[in-house]
Amino acid sequence: MRDVYNPPLDMNKYKFNEKEKIGKVRDYIDSTYDKHYSHGGEQATEVIKGSGHLEGFCIGNIIKYAQRYGKKVGEDKNNNLMKIVHYAIILMEEQDGNDRGSR
């Protein structure tokens, strides 16, 4: 029997090529993990999270990269978009963790 409430990803009728874009976002995020600065094995983002400032840090970076979008001549606009999406995902995970902690 087909599960109509949870269709396979391929069955969704995407209008804006979201499936491909999600794959590109995943590839971008994967590529960043060998570029992070770390101290004692922790990324700076993890240290910021530990200090209780991750939400503001993510929102600030989302704003920063949104304001930079298309401003630098010769820069790939997608790079700023990828950073925005990555910080949004980190923020979503932080919010999910906060929601789990408040239950």
Each language-model region and where it sits:
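Intrinsically disordered, low-complexity regulatory regions
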Residues: 1-103
